[in-house]
């Protein structure tokens, strides 16, 4: 059998992953043509490497069409329902750090915590006869954080098709849930992160699909995971 490893197809995440695997003794034999999305590792015929976007990797892990892949923990938790029963985070890789956060307009001077936001949500319903609008691409993480962790029920998620951080200024949402690495984009859009508004501290992870596989394949996956752990 052949084990399929999916890697990010472009950008810093791809470069960091390829370098990490090289340092761990798994040098990727990159295709000469960048339009080709298949590769291999010298001396390891049982492992096939494919290049996909980080979001595609999370989806294909959920489907079980690949054995393991490198993607963001935020995408795993957002994309895969009941993710812990479907996949395993075999290693956190120490790069690709970013936080999924709740951010509100800076002019909301008296709102600094989720408890404050709960009061605001109730006030919106009373004063404006509508629910607090949250722009985000992270529907699942937002619902879990607001409803399950903080007991906030009076809100409405609006779909974010473009730059999420611009939604409050555009009038399409009141607050946002988005991912940030430095916070500079939030600040440029006059938004602030709530004191207890970090939903997830994400990073790049090696993620393994939970499925039946031959012992030889399982051993190869375990060896690779051990080699890249930091």
From Swiss-Prot:
Domain of life per record: Bacteria
Give the GO biological process terms.
L-histidine biosynthetic process
Listed InterPro entries: ATP_PRibTrfase_cat, ATP_PRibTrfase_CS, ATP_PRibTrfase_HisG
Work out whether the entry's keyword set contains Amino-acid biosynthesis. Answer: yes
Any single Pfam family the record assigns to this protein: HisG
| EC assignment | 2.4.2.17
Predominant location category: cytoplasm
The cysteines covalently paired via disulfide bonds are none
Role summary: Catalyzes the condensation of ATP and 5-phosphoribose 1-diphosphate to form N'-(5'-phosphoribosyl)-ATP (PR-ATP). Has a crucial role in the pathway because the rate of histidine biosynthesis seems to be controlled primarily by regulation of HisG enzymatic activity.
The name on file for this protein is: ATP phosphoribosyltransferase
Give the species. Chelativorans sp. (strain BNC1)
The upper taxonomy is: Bacteria, Pseudomonadati, Pseudomonadota, Alphaproteobacteria, Hyphomicrobiales
State the gene name recorded for this protein.
hisG
């Amino acid at each position: 059998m052949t084990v399929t490893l999916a890697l990010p197809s472009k950008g810093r995440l791809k470069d960091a992953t390829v370098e990490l695997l090289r340092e761990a003794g798994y040098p990727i034999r990159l295709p000469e043509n960048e339009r080709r999305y298949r590769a291999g590792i010298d001396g390891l015929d049982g492992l096939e490497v494919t290049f996909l976007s980080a979001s595609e990797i999370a989806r294909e892990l959920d489907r079980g069409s690949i054995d393991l892949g490198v993607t963001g923990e935020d995408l795993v938790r957002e994309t895969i329902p009941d993710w812990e029963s479907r996949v395993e985070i075999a290693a956190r890789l120490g790069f690709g750090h970013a936080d999924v956060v709740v951010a509100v307009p800076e002019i909301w001077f008296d709102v600094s915590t989720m408890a404050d936001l709960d009061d605001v949500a109730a006030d919106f319903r009373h004063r404006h006869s509508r629910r607090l609008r949250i722009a985000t691409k992270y529907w699942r993480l937002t619902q879990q954080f607001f409803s399950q962790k903080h007991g906030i029920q009076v809100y409405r998620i609006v779909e974010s098709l473009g730059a999420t951080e611009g939604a409050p200024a555009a009038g399409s949402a009141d607050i946002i849930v988005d991912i940030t690495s430095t916070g500079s984009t939030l600040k440029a859009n006059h938004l602030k992160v709530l004191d207890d508004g970090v939903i997830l501290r994400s990073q790049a992870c090696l993620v393994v699909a939970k499925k039946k596989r031959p012992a030889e394949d399982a051993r190869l996956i375990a060896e690779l995971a051990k080699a890249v752990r930091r």
